[in-house]
Amino acid sequence: MRKIIFIISFLIFTSANAEISKDDENKLTNCTGIYYAYSMIPQGQLELDKIVHSIAAKKFLNSYLIEKGVNDEKLNKELLKIVDELYGKPYDENSVKKCDEFIYKTISNSKDEILKIINSGIY
């Protein structure tokens, strides 16, 4: 009986702390960059709720990626590349929807965590 409990505990613990795949890391980094770029669009050019969503999602993903072992400096360099690409371009609703769907599917509880950030008013 002890062996079964130990094995189950081991499986749960190791899967909870599992690293993310390189492909997921790249997609999440790209989405973080998209949110980052759109969070800087002036309020007069984009609805406030979309800007706030972008800020909250960027904040959540940035923390998540660092927590999963992505190097902070490397992440910032990648984000700046993406922001440079998107800066001055119009808001793309489709890319945001794709990122939202991917994040909600890939990271459990991510939708609720992003909503907590939005509702906290602390971006």
Residue ranges and their predicted role:
Residues 14-21, 78-83:
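Short amphipathic alpha-helical segments and their helix-coil junctions
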